Regions:
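Left-handed beta-helix
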Residues: 1-141
Length: 141
Protein backbone atom coordinates (compact mmCIF):
# COMPACT_ATOMS: atom_id res chain seq x y z
CA UNK A 1 0.00 0.00 0.00
CA UNK A 2 1.01 3.59 -0.42
CA UNK A 3 0.27 6.38 2.06
CA UNK A 4 -1.47 9.53 0.88
CA UNK A 5 1.72 11.54 1.49
CA UNK A 6 4.08 9.19 -0.39
CA UNK A 7 5.52 9.96 -3.82
CA UNK A 8 6.20 7.02 -6.13
CA UNK A 9 7.32 7.59 -9.73
CA UNK A 10 8.29 5.02 -12.42
CA UNK A 11 8.29 2.08 -10.05
CA UNK A 12 7.28 -1.53 -9.63
CA UNK A 13 5.87 -2.37 -6.20
CA UNK A 14 5.41 -5.92 -4.93
CA UNK A 15 2.32 -7.17 -3.12
CA UNK A 16 2.14 -6.36 0.58
CA UNK A 17 4.69 -3.53 0.44
CA UNK A 18 4.10 -0.34 2.43
CA UNK A 19 5.59 2.94 1.26
CA UNK A 20 5.40 6.01 3.46
CA UNK A 21 8.36 7.83 1.86
CA UNK A 22 9.35 8.34 -1.78
CA UNK A 23 10.32 5.88 -4.52
CA UNK A 24 11.77 7.00 -7.86
CA UNK A 25 12.61 4.68 -10.80
CA UNK A 26 12.96 1.69 -8.49
CA UNK A 27 11.81 -1.91 -8.01
CA UNK A 28 10.30 -2.52 -4.57
CA UNK A 29 9.82 -6.23 -3.76
CA UNK A 30 6.94 -7.88 -1.91
CA UNK A 31 6.61 -7.20 1.80
CA UNK A 32 8.98 -4.21 1.81
CA UNK A 33 8.34 -1.29 4.16
CA UNK A 34 9.80 2.16 3.46
CA UNK A 35 9.48 4.54 6.42
CA UNK A 36 8.35 8.17 6.62
CA UNK A 37 10.71 10.73 5.13
CA UNK A 38 12.75 8.10 3.28
CA UNK A 39 13.73 8.38 -0.39
CA UNK A 40 14.66 5.48 -2.68
CA UNK A 41 16.11 6.41 -6.11
CA UNK A 42 17.19 4.16 -9.00
CA UNK A 43 17.39 1.11 -6.74
CA UNK A 44 16.25 -2.49 -6.34
CA UNK A 45 14.88 -3.46 -2.92
CA UNK A 46 14.19 -7.19 -2.65
CA UNK A 47 11.36 -8.86 -0.70
CA UNK A 48 11.01 -8.59 3.05
CA UNK A 49 13.40 -5.66 3.51
CA UNK A 50 12.51 -3.05 6.13
CA UNK A 51 13.72 0.53 5.64
CA UNK A 52 13.49 2.98 8.54
CA UNK A 53 12.60 6.66 8.61
CA UNK A 54 14.59 9.51 7.01
CA UNK A 55 16.72 7.13 4.93
CA UNK A 56 18.21 8.09 1.55
CA UNK A 57 19.05 5.25 -0.85
CA UNK A 58 20.56 6.08 -4.25
CA UNK A 59 21.59 3.49 -6.84
CA UNK A 60 21.57 0.45 -4.55
CA UNK A 61 20.70 -3.22 -4.77
CA UNK A 62 19.49 -4.54 -1.42
CA UNK A 63 18.91 -8.30 -1.12
CA UNK A 64 16.10 -10.10 0.71
CA UNK A 65 15.18 -9.61 4.36
CA UNK A 66 17.52 -6.74 5.18
CA UNK A 67 16.98 -4.14 7.87
CA UNK A 68 18.00 -0.54 7.23
CA UNK A 69 17.80 1.65 10.36
CA UNK A 70 16.65 5.27 10.66
CA UNK A 71 18.74 8.17 9.31
CA UNK A 72 20.89 5.96 7.05
CA UNK A 73 22.40 7.13 3.76
CA UNK A 74 23.34 4.60 1.07
CA UNK A 75 25.17 5.67 -2.11
CA UNK A 76 24.98 9.35 -1.29
CA UNK A 77 27.78 11.89 -1.20
CA UNK A 78 30.74 13.06 -3.19
CA UNK A 79 32.55 10.90 -5.67
CA UNK A 80 35.92 10.00 -4.19
CA UNK A 81 39.07 8.66 -5.84
CA UNK A 82 39.66 4.93 -5.52
CA UNK A 83 42.05 4.14 -2.66
CA UNK A 84 44.26 2.08 -4.99
CA UNK A 85 44.18 4.29 -8.09
CA UNK A 86 43.37 7.98 -7.70
CA UNK A 87 42.43 8.26 -11.40
CA UNK A 88 39.42 5.99 -10.78
CA UNK A 89 36.44 7.59 -9.07
CA UNK A 90 33.76 5.68 -7.19
CA UNK A 91 30.48 6.20 -9.05
CA UNK A 92 29.15 2.65 -8.69
CA UNK A 93 26.28 0.93 -6.99
CA UNK A 94 25.86 0.00 -3.37
CA UNK A 95 25.17 -3.73 -2.96
CA UNK A 96 23.95 -5.31 0.28
CA UNK A 97 23.68 -9.08 0.77
CA UNK A 98 20.71 -10.94 2.23
CA UNK A 99 19.71 -10.85 5.90
CA UNK A 100 21.96 -7.85 6.59
CA UNK A 101 21.43 -5.06 9.08
CA UNK A 102 22.58 -1.50 8.47
CA UNK A 103 22.03 0.19 11.84
CA UNK A 104 20.63 3.69 12.37
CA UNK A 105 22.80 6.73 11.63
CA UNK A 106 25.23 4.89 9.31
CA UNK A 107 26.55 6.47 6.10
CA UNK A 108 27.56 4.21 3.20
CA UNK A 109 29.31 5.78 0.20
CA UNK A 110 29.09 4.96 -3.50
CA UNK A 111 30.61 1.84 -5.09
CA UNK A 112 30.44 -0.19 -1.86
CA UNK A 113 29.67 -3.84 -1.20
CA UNK A 114 28.28 -5.31 2.02
CA UNK A 115 28.10 -9.09 2.29
CA UNK A 116 25.12 -10.95 3.70
CA UNK A 117 24.32 -11.34 7.41
CA UNK A 118 26.06 -8.19 8.62
CA UNK A 119 25.04 -6.74 12.00
CA UNK A 120 25.49 -3.42 13.80
CA UNK A 121 28.84 -4.63 15.16
CA UNK A 122 30.19 -4.57 11.58
CA UNK A 123 29.86 -0.74 11.49
CA UNK A 124 32.00 0.44 14.44
CA UNK A 125 32.83 3.79 12.82
CA UNK A 126 29.29 4.44 11.54
CA UNK A 127 30.62 5.07 8.03
CA UNK A 128 31.66 3.00 5.03
CA UNK A 129 33.54 5.20 2.56
CA UNK A 130 33.10 5.01 -1.20
CA UNK A 131 34.86 2.00 -2.68
CA UNK A 132 35.01 0.01 0.60
CA UNK A 133 33.73 -3.50 1.28
CA UNK A 134 32.41 -5.37 4.34
CA UNK A 135 32.85 -9.13 4.03
CA UNK A 136 31.44 -11.40 6.70
CA UNK A 137 31.58 -15.18 6.63
CA UNK A 138 28.22 -16.90 6.93
CA UNK A 139 27.29 -19.26 9.72
CA UNK A 140 28.89 -22.68 9.38
CA UNK A 141 25.80 -24.73 10.25
Amino acid sequence: SQSADSIVLKRIIGEGSEIYGEGHSSFIGAGVTIGNGSVVRDSIIMKGTQIGENVVIDKAIIAENCSIGDNVTLGVGEEKPNKFNEKIYSFGLVTIGEDSEVPSNVSVGKNTAISGKTTKEDYPEGILDSGEVIIKAGDSE
